[in-house]
Protein backbone atom coordinates (compact mmCIF):
# COMPACT_ATOMS: atom_id res chain seq x y z
CA UNK A 1 0.00 0.00 0.00
CA UNK A 2 2.75 2.41 0.91
CA UNK A 3 4.76 1.59 -2.22
CA UNK A 4 1.75 2.18 -4.47
CA UNK A 5 1.03 5.50 -2.80
CA UNK A 6 4.61 6.65 -3.28
CA UNK A 7 4.50 5.58 -6.94
CA UNK A 8 1.34 7.62 -7.57
CA UNK A 9 2.86 10.69 -5.93
CA UNK A 10 6.01 10.42 -8.05
CA UNK A 11 3.94 9.98 -11.22
CA UNK A 12 1.91 13.10 -10.44
CA UNK A 13 5.08 15.08 -9.84
CA UNK A 14 6.54 14.00 -13.19
CA UNK A 15 3.34 14.91 -15.04
CA UNK A 16 3.18 18.35 -13.50
CA UNK A 17 6.70 19.13 -14.83
CA UNK A 18 7.68 22.76 -14.96
CA UNK A 19 4.52 23.88 -13.16
CA UNK A 20 5.63 22.08 -10.02
CA UNK A 21 9.01 23.75 -10.19
CA UNK A 22 7.32 27.09 -10.64
CA UNK A 23 5.21 26.42 -7.56
CA UNK A 24 8.34 25.56 -5.59
CA UNK A 25 9.95 28.82 -6.65
CA UNK A 26 6.79 30.66 -5.73
CA UNK A 27 6.79 29.13 -2.26
CA UNK A 28 10.42 30.05 -1.79
CA UNK A 29 9.63 33.62 -2.79
CA UNK A 30 6.54 33.99 -0.66
CA UNK A 31 7.56 31.71 2.17
CA UNK A 32 9.68 32.82 5.06
CA UNK A 33 10.65 36.45 5.13
CA UNK A 34 13.82 37.64 3.50
CA UNK A 35 16.15 40.26 4.82
CA UNK A 36 19.17 40.08 7.09
CA UNK A 37 18.86 39.81 10.85
CA UNK A 38 22.11 41.71 11.42
CA UNK A 39 20.41 44.92 10.25
CA UNK A 40 18.89 45.03 13.74
CA UNK A 41 22.19 46.08 15.32
CA UNK A 42 21.44 49.59 14.08
CA UNK A 43 18.95 49.91 16.95
CA UNK A 44 21.14 48.71 19.83
CA UNK A 45 22.56 52.11 20.76
CA UNK A 46 25.10 54.76 19.90
CA UNK A 47 28.20 53.34 18.13
CA UNK A 48 30.55 55.20 20.49
CA UNK A 49 28.96 53.46 23.49
CA UNK A 50 29.42 49.95 22.10
CA UNK A 51 31.99 47.84 23.98
CA UNK A 52 33.75 44.74 22.58
CA UNK A 53 31.92 42.39 24.96
CA UNK A 54 28.47 43.67 24.03
CA UNK A 55 28.13 40.95 21.37
CA UNK A 56 26.99 38.76 24.27
CA UNK A 57 24.11 41.15 25.00
CA UNK A 58 20.81 39.37 24.23
CA UNK A 59 19.63 42.23 22.01
CA UNK A 60 22.73 41.88 19.83
CA UNK A 61 23.12 38.13 20.20
CA UNK A 62 19.67 37.52 18.71
CA UNK A 63 20.41 39.56 15.58
CA UNK A 64 23.65 37.78 14.64
CA UNK A 65 24.29 34.32 13.25
CA UNK A 66 26.83 32.06 14.88
CA UNK A 67 29.51 32.86 12.31
CA UNK A 68 28.86 36.59 12.66
CA UNK A 69 29.17 36.37 16.44
CA UNK A 70 32.50 34.59 16.00
CA UNK A 71 33.76 37.29 13.64
CA UNK A 72 32.79 39.96 16.17
CA UNK A 73 34.45 38.05 18.99
CA UNK A 74 37.69 37.44 17.06
CA UNK A 75 37.98 41.05 15.87
CA UNK A 76 37.60 43.24 18.99
CA UNK A 77 36.29 46.69 18.24
CA UNK A 78 34.49 45.69 15.06
CA UNK A 79 31.03 45.74 16.65
CA UNK A 80 31.02 49.52 17.01
CA UNK A 81 32.01 49.88 13.36
CA UNK A 82 29.20 47.53 12.33
CA UNK A 83 26.63 49.55 14.29
CA UNK A 84 27.97 52.72 12.73
CA UNK A 85 27.81 51.15 9.28
CA UNK A 86 24.23 49.98 9.73
CA UNK A 87 23.11 53.45 10.81
CA UNK A 88 25.09 55.00 7.98
CA UNK A 89 23.23 52.80 5.50
CA UNK A 90 19.83 53.75 6.94
CA UNK A 91 20.51 57.49 6.93
CA UNK A 92 21.92 57.42 3.39
CA UNK A 93 19.02 55.33 2.10
CA UNK A 94 16.53 57.75 3.62
CA UNK A 95 18.40 60.71 2.15
CA UNK A 96 18.46 59.24 -1.36
CA UNK A 97 14.75 58.38 -1.30
CA UNK A 98 13.46 61.33 0.70
CA UNK A 99 11.51 62.58 -2.34
CA UNK A 100 10.22 59.21 -3.52
CA UNK A 101 7.01 57.35 -2.79
CA UNK A 102 9.08 54.74 -0.99
CA UNK A 103 11.27 56.73 1.39
CA UNK A 104 13.21 53.89 3.06
CA UNK A 105 11.30 54.32 6.30
CA UNK A 106 12.28 52.23 9.32
CA UNK A 107 10.10 54.07 11.85
CA UNK A 108 7.13 51.71 12.03
CA UNK A 109 8.96 48.42 11.62
CA UNK A 110 10.54 46.03 14.08
CA UNK A 111 14.19 45.17 14.34
CA UNK A 112 16.15 42.52 12.52
CA UNK A 113 15.29 41.44 9.01
CA UNK A 114 12.05 43.46 9.16
CA UNK A 115 13.89 46.71 9.85
CA UNK A 116 12.96 48.04 6.41
CA UNK A 117 9.55 46.40 6.42
CA UNK A 118 8.25 43.50 4.38
CA UNK A 119 9.35 45.10 1.15
CA UNK A 120 12.49 42.95 1.43
CA UNK A 121 10.27 39.90 0.89
CA UNK A 122 9.98 41.05 -2.70
CA UNK A 123 12.87 40.94 -5.13
CA UNK A 124 12.23 44.48 -6.40
CA UNK A 125 14.49 47.47 -7.05
CA UNK A 126 14.08 48.84 -3.54
CA UNK A 127 15.30 45.56 -2.05
CA UNK A 128 18.32 45.57 -4.34
CA UNK A 129 19.27 49.05 -3.11
CA UNK A 130 18.86 48.04 0.55
CA UNK A 131 21.27 45.13 0.14
CA UNK A 132 23.78 47.19 -1.82
CA UNK A 133 23.79 50.18 0.53
CA UNK A 134 24.09 48.06 3.70
CA UNK A 135 26.97 46.04 2.24
CA UNK A 136 28.70 49.22 1.08
CA UNK A 137 28.23 50.89 4.46
CA UNK A 138 29.82 47.97 6.32
CA UNK A 139 32.78 47.96 3.91
CA UNK A 140 33.22 51.71 4.29
CA UNK A 141 32.86 51.73 8.07
CA UNK A 142 35.23 48.80 8.66
CA UNK A 143 37.90 50.18 6.31
CA UNK A 144 37.77 53.57 8.01
CA UNK A 145 37.78 52.05 11.52
CA UNK A 146 40.98 50.16 10.68
CA UNK A 147 42.81 53.38 9.81
CA UNK A 148 41.42 55.04 12.94
CA UNK A 149 42.78 52.22 15.11
CA UNK A 150 39.47 51.17 16.66
CA UNK A 151 39.69 47.53 15.49
CA UNK A 152 42.46 45.51 17.11
CA UNK A 153 42.86 42.97 14.30
CA UNK A 154 43.61 45.46 11.51
CA UNK A 155 45.68 48.57 10.94
CA UNK A 156 46.23 51.12 8.20
CA UNK A 157 46.79 49.76 4.71
CA UNK A 158 50.56 49.84 4.21
CA UNK A 159 50.51 47.75 1.03
CA UNK A 160 51.22 50.75 -1.21
CA UNK A 161 54.46 51.43 0.65
CA UNK A 162 55.64 47.91 -0.21
CA UNK A 163 55.67 48.68 -3.95
CA UNK A 164 58.97 48.48 -5.75
CA UNK A 165 60.96 51.72 -6.16
CA UNK A 166 60.62 51.38 -9.96
CA UNK A 167 56.83 51.43 -9.72
CA UNK A 168 56.96 54.50 -7.52
CA UNK A 169 59.28 56.27 -9.95
CA UNK A 170 56.94 55.53 -12.85
CA UNK A 171 53.96 56.78 -10.86
CA UNK A 172 55.82 59.85 -9.60
CA UNK A 173 56.97 61.57 -12.76
CA UNK A 174 57.78 61.02 -16.39
CA UNK A 175 61.47 61.70 -15.88
CA UNK A 176 61.72 58.92 -13.33
CA UNK A 177 62.45 61.28 -10.44
CA UNK A 178 59.89 60.69 -7.73
CA UNK A 179 58.27 63.87 -6.45
CA UNK A 180 55.99 62.13 -3.96
CA UNK A 181 56.09 59.13 -1.63
CA UNK A 182 53.59 56.71 -0.20
CA UNK A 183 53.04 57.44 3.47
CA UNK A 184 50.44 58.39 5.99
CA UNK A 185 47.64 56.01 6.87
CA UNK A 186 45.59 54.61 4.01
CA UNK A 187 42.08 53.36 4.69
CA UNK A 188 42.19 49.57 4.75
CA UNK A 189 39.79 48.77 1.91
CA UNK A 190 41.16 45.24 1.60
CA UNK A 191 40.18 44.33 5.14
CA UNK A 192 36.84 46.12 4.85
CA UNK A 193 35.98 44.35 1.59
CA UNK A 194 36.89 40.91 2.89
CA UNK A 195 35.20 41.37 6.25
CA UNK A 196 32.04 42.61 4.57
CA UNK A 197 31.97 39.48 2.43
CA UNK A 198 32.38 37.20 5.41
CA UNK A 199 29.92 39.06 7.64
CA UNK A 200 27.22 40.44 5.35
CA UNK A 201 27.00 37.45 3.01
CA UNK A 202 26.56 34.95 5.83
CA UNK A 203 23.46 32.91 5.06
CA UNK A 204 23.46 33.80 1.35
CA UNK A 205 24.58 30.51 -0.17
CA UNK A 206 23.57 31.30 -3.73
CA UNK A 207 21.39 28.22 -4.09
CA UNK A 208 18.45 30.02 -5.71
CA UNK A 209 17.92 33.10 -7.80
CA UNK A 210 16.91 35.33 -4.87
CA UNK A 211 20.11 34.52 -2.99
CA UNK A 212 22.11 35.16 -6.14
CA UNK A 213 20.37 38.50 -6.48
CA UNK A 214 21.35 39.36 -2.90
CA UNK A 215 24.95 38.29 -3.45
CA UNK A 216 25.25 40.30 -6.66
CA UNK A 217 23.88 43.46 -5.05
CA UNK A 218 26.10 43.00 -1.99
CA UNK A 219 29.11 42.74 -4.28
CA UNK A 220 27.97 45.80 -6.24
CA UNK A 221 27.84 47.87 -3.07
CA UNK A 222 31.35 46.82 -2.09
CA UNK A 223 32.65 47.46 -5.62
CA UNK A 224 31.41 51.05 -5.54
CA UNK A 225 33.21 51.72 -2.25
CA UNK A 226 36.41 50.29 -3.64
CA UNK A 227 36.16 52.16 -6.94
CA UNK A 228 35.84 55.51 -5.16
CA UNK A 229 39.16 55.24 -3.30
CA UNK A 230 41.08 58.45 -3.92
CA UNK A 231 44.68 59.49 -3.47
CA UNK A 232 45.26 62.33 -1.01
CA UNK A 233 48.57 64.09 -0.59
CA UNK A 234 50.24 66.50 1.82
CA UNK A 235 53.10 68.81 0.90
CA UNK A 236 56.35 68.99 2.86
CA UNK A 237 58.89 71.77 2.43
CA UNK A 238 60.20 75.10 3.61
CA UNK A 239 57.81 78.08 3.66
CA UNK A 240 54.91 76.08 2.33
CA UNK A 241 56.76 74.78 -0.72
CA UNK A 242 55.92 71.33 -2.04
CA UNK A 243 59.37 69.79 -2.25
CA UNK A 244 58.06 66.33 -1.40
CA UNK A 245 54.51 65.07 -1.20
CA UNK A 246 53.33 62.25 1.04
CA UNK A 247 50.32 60.44 -0.38
CA UNK A 248 47.86 57.84 0.86
CA UNK A 249 44.59 56.27 -0.28
CA UNK A 250 41.40 57.60 1.26
CA UNK A 251 37.78 56.50 1.12
CA UNK A 252 35.35 58.87 -0.53
CA UNK A 253 32.57 60.47 1.47
CA UNK A 254 29.77 57.94 1.75
CA UNK A 255 27.40 60.40 0.08
CA UNK A 256 29.34 59.78 -3.14
CA UNK A 257 28.73 56.02 -2.85
CA UNK A 258 25.07 56.68 -2.09
CA UNK A 259 24.71 58.89 -5.17
CA UNK A 260 26.34 56.26 -7.37
CA UNK A 261 24.14 53.46 -6.04
CA UNK A 262 21.05 55.64 -6.50
CA UNK A 263 22.01 56.12 -10.15
CA UNK A 264 22.42 52.34 -10.50
CA UNK A 265 19.01 51.91 -8.86
CA UNK A 266 17.41 54.01 -11.59
CA UNK A 267 19.09 51.86 -14.24
CA UNK A 268 18.82 48.49 -12.48
CA UNK A 269 18.60 45.31 -14.56
CA UNK A 270 15.76 42.85 -14.20
CA UNK A 271 17.04 39.27 -14.26
CA UNK A 272 15.34 35.90 -14.49
CA UNK A 273 15.98 32.18 -14.35
CA UNK A 274 15.94 30.53 -17.76
CA UNK A 275 13.82 27.44 -18.49
CA UNK A 276 16.90 25.32 -19.14
CA UNK A 277 18.21 26.14 -15.68
CA UNK A 278 14.90 26.15 -13.81
CA UNK A 279 15.30 22.55 -12.69
CA UNK A 280 18.45 23.44 -10.76
CA UNK A 281 16.55 26.16 -8.89
CA UNK A 282 19.46 28.50 -9.60
CA UNK A 283 21.59 29.81 -12.39
CA UNK A 284 24.44 27.48 -13.18
CA UNK A 285 27.97 28.69 -12.51
CA UNK A 286 29.79 30.06 -15.52
CA UNK A 287 32.81 28.18 -16.76
CA UNK A 288 36.13 29.88 -16.04
CA UNK A 289 36.75 30.43 -19.74
CA UNK A 290 33.35 32.01 -20.43
CA UNK A 291 33.06 35.70 -21.07
CA UNK A 292 32.29 37.68 -17.99
CA UNK A 293 33.04 34.81 -15.60
CA UNK A 294 35.29 34.51 -12.58
CA UNK A 295 37.87 31.97 -11.55
CA UNK A 296 39.07 31.04 -8.09
CA UNK A 297 42.71 31.79 -7.44
CA UNK A 298 45.09 29.70 -5.36
CA UNK A 299 44.40 31.88 -2.35
CA UNK A 300 40.66 31.28 -2.59
CA UNK A 301 39.81 34.79 -3.84
CA UNK A 302 37.57 35.45 -6.80
CA UNK A 303 39.65 36.58 -9.77
CA UNK A 304 37.61 38.24 -12.54
CA UNK A 305 38.23 37.28 -16.17
CA UNK A 306 36.53 40.29 -17.76
CA UNK A 307 35.93 42.82 -15.01
CA UNK A 308 32.85 41.11 -13.55
CA UNK A 309 33.79 42.03 -10.01
CA UNK A 310 36.89 44.23 -10.07
CA UNK A 311 39.03 46.22 -12.45
CA UNK A 312 42.72 45.47 -12.86
CA UNK A 313 43.82 47.93 -10.15
CA UNK A 314 41.24 46.66 -7.67
CA UNK A 315 42.14 43.04 -8.44
CA UNK A 316 45.81 43.76 -7.83
CA UNK A 317 45.09 45.52 -4.55
CA UNK A 318 42.85 42.78 -3.19
CA UNK A 319 44.81 39.75 -4.33
CA UNK A 320 48.34 41.06 -3.81
CA UNK A 321 47.78 42.94 -0.56
CA UNK A 322 45.02 41.14 1.30
CA UNK A 323 45.25 42.00 5.01
CA UNK A 324 44.90 39.55 7.83
CA UNK A 325 41.36 38.67 8.87
CA UNK A 326 40.01 35.85 10.96
CA UNK A 327 37.63 33.88 8.79
CA UNK A 328 35.46 30.83 9.21
CA UNK A 329 37.35 27.90 10.75
CA UNK A 330 39.91 30.48 12.05
CA UNK A 331 42.04 30.35 8.88
CA UNK A 332 43.59 33.79 8.25
CA UNK A 333 44.07 34.75 4.62
CA UNK A 334 46.97 37.05 3.92
CA UNK A 335 49.35 37.91 1.12
CA UNK A 336 51.26 40.77 2.76
CA UNK A 337 53.67 40.11 5.59
CA UNK A 338 53.89 42.43 8.59
CA UNK A 339 55.67 41.71 11.86
CA UNK A 340 52.35 41.14 13.61
CA UNK A 341 50.93 38.94 10.87
CA UNK A 342 51.61 35.28 10.04
CA UNK A 343 53.83 34.52 7.08
CA UNK A 344 51.89 34.06 3.82
CA UNK A 345 53.73 30.82 3.14
CA UNK A 346 52.39 29.32 6.36
CA UNK A 347 48.75 29.95 5.51
CA UNK A 348 46.63 27.05 4.28
CA UNK A 349 45.34 27.51 0.74
CA UNK A 350 41.67 27.06 -0.03
CA UNK A 351 42.30 24.36 -2.58
CA UNK A 352 44.61 22.41 -0.25
CA UNK A 353 42.19 21.87 2.60
CA UNK A 354 40.80 18.42 2.75
CA UNK A 355 37.61 16.90 4.08
CA UNK A 356 34.48 18.78 4.99
CA UNK A 357 36.26 22.11 5.56
CA UNK A 358 37.72 22.05 2.06
CA UNK A 359 34.36 21.32 0.46
CA UNK A 360 32.73 24.05 2.54
CA UNK A 361 35.40 26.55 1.49
CA UNK A 362 34.89 25.61 -2.15
CA UNK A 363 31.14 26.09 -1.91
CA UNK A 364 31.64 29.44 -0.18
CA UNK A 365 33.70 30.84 -3.05
CA UNK A 366 31.61 29.21 -5.79
CA UNK A 367 28.61 31.23 -4.66
CA UNK A 368 30.15 34.27 -6.39
CA UNK A 369 30.84 32.23 -9.52
CA UNK A 370 27.83 32.96 -11.71
CA UNK A 371 26.44 35.26 -14.38
CA UNK A 372 22.85 36.53 -14.19
CA UNK A 373 20.74 36.67 -17.36
CA UNK A 374 18.67 39.78 -18.17
CA UNK A 375 14.89 39.40 -18.30
CA UNK A 376 14.92 41.09 -21.69
CA UNK A 377 17.22 39.09 -24.00
CA UNK A 378 18.02 42.27 -25.95
CA UNK A 379 19.64 43.82 -22.88
CA UNK A 380 23.24 43.15 -21.96
CA UNK A 381 24.03 41.15 -18.80
CA UNK A 382 24.45 43.21 -15.63
CA UNK A 383 27.93 44.40 -14.78
CA UNK A 384 29.73 44.17 -11.47
CA UNK A 385 28.46 47.56 -10.26
CA UNK A 386 24.91 47.23 -11.59
CA UNK A 387 21.97 46.48 -9.33
CA UNK A 388 19.66 43.60 -10.25
CA UNK A 389 16.09 42.75 -9.31
CA UNK A 390 13.55 40.00 -10.02
CA UNK A 391 10.12 41.61 -10.11
CA UNK A 392 8.55 45.04 -10.67
CA UNK A 393 8.10 47.35 -7.71
CA UNK A 394 4.64 48.02 -6.28
CA UNK A 395 3.16 51.50 -6.71
CA UNK A 396 3.59 52.42 -3.01
CA UNK A 397 0.52 54.66 -3.35
CA UNK A 398 -1.84 53.02 -0.86
CA UNK A 399 -1.09 51.75 2.61
CA UNK A 400 -0.67 47.99 2.77
CA UNK A 401 0.91 46.83 6.02
CA UNK A 402 0.72 43.23 4.88
CA UNK A 403 3.28 44.08 2.21
CA UNK A 404 5.09 46.67 4.33
CA UNK A 405 3.87 49.63 2.26
CA UNK A 406 3.03 52.84 4.16
CA UNK A 407 1.45 54.70 1.24
CA UNK A 408 1.81 58.39 0.40
CA UNK A 409 -1.19 59.82 2.27
CA UNK A 410 0.01 62.82 4.29
CA UNK A 411 3.39 63.05 2.53
CA UNK A 412 4.69 66.49 1.61
CA UNK A 413 5.24 67.17 -2.08
CA UNK A 414 6.67 69.86 -4.36
CA UNK A 415 3.87 71.66 -6.16
CA UNK A 416 6.13 73.13 -8.86
CA UNK A 417 8.11 69.97 -9.67
CA UNK A 418 7.39 67.63 -12.57
CA UNK A 419 9.68 64.95 -11.14
CA UNK A 420 9.08 62.10 -8.73
CA UNK A 421 8.85 64.57 -5.83
CA UNK A 422 6.10 66.55 -7.54
CA UNK A 423 2.56 66.45 -6.21
CA UNK A 424 1.31 64.83 -9.40
CA UNK A 425 3.42 61.69 -8.98
CA UNK A 426 3.85 61.65 -5.21
CA UNK A 427 0.10 61.85 -4.57
CA UNK A 428 -0.75 59.25 -7.24
CA UNK A 429 -3.40 61.51 -8.77
CA UNK A 430 -5.45 61.78 -5.56
CA UNK A 431 -4.86 65.51 -5.20
CA UNK A 432 -3.15 67.51 -2.49
CA UNK A 433 -3.85 70.14 0.13
CA UNK A 434 -2.27 73.60 0.45
CA UNK A 435 -1.50 74.89 3.95
CA UNK A 436 0.24 77.94 5.35
CA UNK A 437 2.28 77.34 8.47
CA UNK A 438 4.37 79.58 10.71
CA UNK A 439 7.90 78.30 11.22
CA UNK A 440 10.13 79.55 14.05
CA UNK A 441 13.80 79.52 13.08
CA UNK A 442 17.05 80.87 14.49
CA UNK A 443 18.36 83.82 12.52
CA UNK A 444 20.78 86.77 12.68
CA UNK A 445 23.34 84.75 14.63
CA UNK A 446 26.43 86.57 15.90
CA UNK A 447 29.56 85.43 17.70
CA UNK A 448 30.41 87.07 21.04
CA UNK A 449 33.88 86.83 22.59
CA UNK A 450 34.35 84.52 24.26
CA UNK A 451 32.79 82.06 23.39
CA UNK A 452 29.12 82.27 22.64
CA UNK A 453 26.83 82.44 19.63
CA UNK A 454 23.63 84.43 20.08
CA UNK A 455 20.71 84.19 17.68
CA UNK A 456 17.31 85.75 17.28
CA UNK A 457 14.11 83.80 16.77
CA UNK A 458 12.43 84.66 13.50
CA UNK A 459 8.93 83.69 12.45
CA UNK A 460 8.35 83.03 8.78
CA UNK A 461 5.32 81.83 6.86
CA UNK A 462 5.76 78.84 4.59
CA UNK A 463 3.40 77.11 2.20
CA UNK A 464 3.43 73.31 2.30
CA UNK A 465 1.60 70.87 0.07
CA UNK A 466 0.38 67.57 1.50
CA UNK A 467 -0.98 64.56 -0.37
CA UNK A 468 -4.61 63.68 0.29
UniProtKB/Swiss-Prot annotation:
Domain of life of the native organism: Eukaryota
Annotated glycosylation sites: 103, 108, 414
Lipidation (O-palmitoleoyl serine): 239
Keyword Ribosomal protein: no
InterPro entries recorded: Wnt, Wnt_C, Wnt_CS
Keyword list, A-Z: Developmental protein, Disulfide bond, Extracellular matrix, Glycoprotein, Lipoprotein, Membrane, Morphogen, Secreted, Segmentation polarity protein, Signal, Synapse, Wnt signaling pathway
BP terms from Gene Ontology: anterior/posterior pattern specification, imaginal disc; branch fusion, open tracheal system; branching morphogenesis of an epithelial tube; canonical Wnt signaling pathway; cardioblast differentiation; cell elongation involved in imaginal disc-derived wing morphogenesis; cell fate commitment; chitin-based larval cuticle pattern formation
Disulfide bonds: 93-104, 146-154, 156-185, 233-247, 235-242, 397-428, 413-423, 427-467, 443-458, 445-455, 450-451
Places the protein is found: Secreted; Synapse; Membrane; Secreted, Extracellular space, Extracellular matrix
Tissues in which the UniProt entry reports expression: Segmented expression in embryos. In embryonic tracheal cells, expression is in stripes flanking the tracheal placode.
Region of interest (Disordered), ranges: 333-362
Post-translational modification: Palmitoleoylated by porcupine. The lipid group functions as a sorting signal, targeting the ligand to polarized vesicles that transport wg to unique sites at the cell surface. Depalmitoleoylated by notum, leading to inhibit Wnt signaling pathway. Major form is glycosylated at 2 sites, glycosylation is stimulated by porcupine at the ER.
Region (Binds porcupine): 83-106
Job of this protein: Binds as a ligand to a family of frizzled seven-transmembrane receptors and acts through a cascade of genes on the nucleus. Segment polarity protein. May be a growth factor. Acts on neighboring cells to regulate at least one gene, the homeobox segmentation gene engrailed. Wg signal represses arm phosphorylation. Wg signaling operates by inactivating the sgg repression of engrailed autoactivation. Wg and Wnt2 have a role in the developing trachea and together are responsible for all dorsal trunk formation. Wg also acts in the developing epidermis.
Protein name, per record: Protein wingless
Gene name of this polypeptide: wg
